[in-house]
A protein has these predicted regions:
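Cleavable N-terminal signal peptides of Sec/SRP-targeted secreted and luminal proteins
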Residues: 3-17
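N-terminal, motif-rich segments that launch catalysis or mediate targeting to/interaction with membranes
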Residues: 15-149, 154-157, 161-215
Length: 215
């Protein structure tokens, strides 16, 4: 697989809308790996289509498998045999590190956006993005992929652990990847939901009269 496709995968996966990343596969229960896979392949497809069209050839994958996406992305003038196995391996590196966050950082509130750790969670995301870009510039793609997996886990946990959707938001929270923008309407530890196991509290009205963002 060419380094160009690796750059596409690494550079643009984080640009996938975070809410899009939570579309279940096959109508079943979403896991971190299924969410990550859906988001990455969707973004790679979108990006490869744009790159192919800019190069003057059609992007017409014969299917949605990683192998078929790789062949369509590289185009008809690609030399040699296209390796879907290498693409699979690159994706697996991301999936593995994504899943290991639950094992290696099980008690870290910022890694999972628990206990109102908004600022710490965003810091992990933004610092991770800086590290990803730096590793891409150095062509250290494996390190970039591994960091991407970890960052995506924390980003996913924001949407699954917070009341973002319950508050009526349908767009990604861009402030999570923009350290120059403030995180607004945040609940503190003393104002968070007193019964977080009970998800039947619409917008947590007793605890959040001003519709504060909480976990």
């Amino acid at each position: 697989m060419t380094s160009g496709l690796g750059i596409v995968l690494l550079s643009l996966a984080l640009m996938a809308g975070p809410t899009v990343a939570f579309v279940p596969i096959g109508g079943g229960v979403s896991t971190h790996i299924s969410i990550t896979g859906t988001a990455l392949l969707q973004k790679v497809t979108e990006t490869c289509r744009a790159v192919a069209e800019a190069a003057g050839h059609e992007f017409k994958p014969t299917g949605s498998s990683p192998e078929e996406l790789v062949k369509a992305c590289l185009g008809p003038t690609a030399k040699g045999e296209v390796s879907g196995a290498k693409f699979h391996s690159a994706l697996q590196e991301i999936y593995t590190q994504n899943g290991l966050v639950d094992r290696d950082f099980v008690n870290s509130a910022p890694h999972h956006f628990n206990s109102e750790a908004f600022l710490g969670g965003r810091r992990l995301i933004t610092e991770g993005m800086v590290a990803i870009k730096a590793n891409i510039r150095k062509e250290n793609f494996q390190a970039a992929r591994e960091t991407l997996g970890k960052v995506l886990h924390t980003l996913q946990d924001f949407y699954s652990h917070s009341n973002w959707v319950e508050l009526g938001y349908t767009e990604p929270y861009i402030n999570l990847i923009r350290p120059d923008l403030p995180l607004e309407n945040l609940a503190g530890l003393n104002t968070a939901c007193s019964d977080c196991a009970n998800r039947d509290m619409p917008n947590h009205p007793p605890q959040h009269p001003e519709r504060n963002l909480s976990f």
